[in-house]
């Protein structure tokens, strides 16, 4: 009897994760096999940034919400947290947790607000140090900060540094601090006219190495009129604008990039245009040398989700959702996802795609390559499907 029950459960799981690919192979990962790496007391997480170092140490940055008022949707007590483990222990990871910043916390001279949350880590491998960029809320509003972390002990440095942005307009170079006023000045100086409102700029969750530089692409959280800005850096702190992407006419709230043969592939979630038919995930292609638009951004997915790109074994892959993270059944939210992984051609169009349906919500992807293998971190609510504010960080190897 037990064997019958087990067989029935396995069959149901197989149906729940029914996958298809144009070409016949299975989806590159089974979400049920992913290991959970977020803090065990985690109640909510909707960010994931991952760095895999040479020795196999994995650092996953995310946010943790100890208290959440699910009635009015307001957050409190949010912490920026880093989970550390090693790939050799992937099946049963031994995890170390480091808190970067808490609400009301302080590093050096920067005092985090007692009432506003701290947000969104973006990890940068600085060689002998791990650098964590994150959002604090201080005297100048949202501020993008950087703090160094000892990769062995996970101890934090005793000071934070503000991230700067340098750009050129009419032959004149300007440098602003990545604060609310600074980023607004950047947009005004480059001539963005329909900038509706400001929250905070959002870099890609990981930095991309190309030649002597690290590259990133910056969007802006839910701000109509915002456009992506491709930047480069050597230290993860001082960012220099290479070119902007005004072709993303519906804005770019959250972005990701991959670079191949001096072509810069950019994928972005729209910044909530008033015309809901325009909302979704868009893909574009640019020349890294002069910023020429080689493929005008086109809608690759009809649902606003936080996508990612990965250059792996000479191929560019895109991952994003193709339906909402929840549906309403009998007056209640039921969470599930349909995930698509697409292989991108040289011109930025889709060559082929894999899809998988999950019985729970999966989103916020970050793909990494390490020694010829591909890995994925993402946010999921495997055990907490009843509430969208609850989530876990999961990690798995991709079969690419």
Where are these regions (language model features)?
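Beta-rich carbohydrate-recognition and catalytic domains
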Residues: 20-46, 51-114, 124-253, 258-305, ...
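Hydrophobic h-region of N-terminal signal peptides that target proteins for export
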Residues: 10-18
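Enrichment for repetitive, rod-forming helical segments
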Residues: 9-10, 276
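C-terminal regions of proteins
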Residues: 361-365
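Sec-dependent signal peptide recognition
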Residues: 2-8
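Elongated alpha-helical scaffolds
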Residues: 116-118
